[in-house]
């Protein structure tokens, strides 16, 4: 079902509608039928789509068409998407004029992933080197990722979960390109941060921010929970644990998936809440109760990986529950692809198939 839907529905939708044949790169703002409603290019999604088509070429079938689509995005990122220091802009116009400065380090993370996979697909050492260079630049920036674009003061310093989380996945993507000791060092750092700092020992759930010493902060950001993020990180942990044959980490990650799901599942309408406040206060995010496609897809990946390693019946039951909700509410059999944004009751809130944050990758 999933393979068929991916290869015969989702990927063809993006092949048909997203390619900018004039400027290169991809249009991601697509309405329900696939028509382009905005031509700006967001570098998170350019990198992710280039990675996706490179990975399809490497792991599913070496179709020349997939490699060409990947190259279109790769060339756009390399020639238009980076500043003189190699930092990746956040967004550009259709023809490649920078719109938003390179304040968001995740643009760089997805570009590095894309360069690495494309380098393998095209057997191009130059892109492997560019992936490595971009990765090392990310490490250099990790303690102050926004640099001069940081708008916060130092009055309430908080550490963010997002970077160690993405590094735990990025380093495995770049494993063949990086020095082995660099890979192990980054994995050690990421696992320590995710499982010992941001995973709260008392509640068993993941917080988005902590104080620099790892303690919890009683503020909007300090109480913030993003269930989809926490669950996604657990499948990164499972991948690392399998690589290291670490049963303890597999079991802890599996247990954490269940804890987060128990906390964040909407018992009234079904689905997983987008944001929550750890103390049950009103969340700062007005969209807190929406149901998002990526949250449910990442949860299905995490549950599938956890079940593969544990055969735990509780995981199987959760998988069925999330699977049934997702296919019932997000899939669009009429026009293809999936809806991204539902209200709390599970009704389509925006009928777009792509936008600033939703793309071909998820």
Give the location of each predicted region.
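Glycan-recognition and catalytic cores of secretory/periplasmic carbohydrate-active enzymes
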Residues: 1-362
């Amino acid at each position: 079902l999933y393979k068929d839907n991916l290869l015969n529905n989702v990927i063809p939708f993006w092949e048909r509608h997203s390619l900018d044949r004039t400027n290169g790169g991809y249009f991601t703002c697509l309405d329900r039928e696939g028509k382009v409603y905005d031509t700006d290019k967001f570098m998170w999604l350019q990198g992710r789509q280039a990675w996706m088509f490179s990975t399809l070429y490497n792991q599913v079938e070496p179709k020349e068409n997939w490699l060409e689509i990947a190259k279109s995005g790769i060339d756009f990122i390399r020639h238009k998407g980076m500043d003189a220091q190699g930092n990746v802009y956040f967004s550009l116009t259709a023809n490649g004029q920078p719109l938003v400065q390179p304040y968001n380090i995740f643009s760089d993370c997805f570009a590095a992933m894309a360069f690495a996979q494309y380098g393998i697909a095209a057997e191009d050492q130059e892109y492997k080197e560019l992936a490595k260079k971009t990765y090392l630049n990310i490490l250099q920036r990790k303690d102050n990722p926004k640099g001069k674009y940081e708008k916060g003061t130092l009055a309430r310093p908080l550490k963010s979960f997002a970077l160690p989380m993405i590094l735990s996945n990025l380093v495995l993507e770049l494993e063949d390109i990086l020095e082995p000791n660099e890979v192990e060092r980054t994995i050690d750092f990421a696992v320590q941060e995710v499982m010992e700092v941001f995973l709260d020992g008392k509640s068993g759930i993941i917080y988005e921010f902590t104080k620099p010493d790892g303690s919890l902060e009683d503020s909007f950001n300090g109480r913030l929970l993003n269930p989809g993020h926490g669950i996604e990180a657990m499948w990164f942990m499972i991948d690392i644990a399998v690589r290291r044959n670490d049963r303890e980490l597999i079991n802890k990650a599996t247990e954490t998936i269940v804890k987060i799901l128990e906390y964040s599942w909407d018992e009234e309408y079904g689905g997983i809440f987008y944001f929550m406040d750890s103390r049950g206060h009103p969340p700062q995010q007005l969209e807190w109760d929406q149901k998002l496609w990526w949250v449910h897809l990442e949860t299905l990946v995490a549950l599938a990986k956890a079940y593969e390693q544990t055969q735990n019946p509780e995981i199987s039951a959760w998988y069925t529950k999330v699977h049934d909700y997702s296919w019932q509410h997000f899939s669009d059999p009429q026009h293809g692809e999936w809806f991204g944004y539902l209200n709390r009751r599970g009704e389509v809130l925006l009928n777009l198939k792509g936008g600033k944050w939703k793309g071909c990758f998820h």
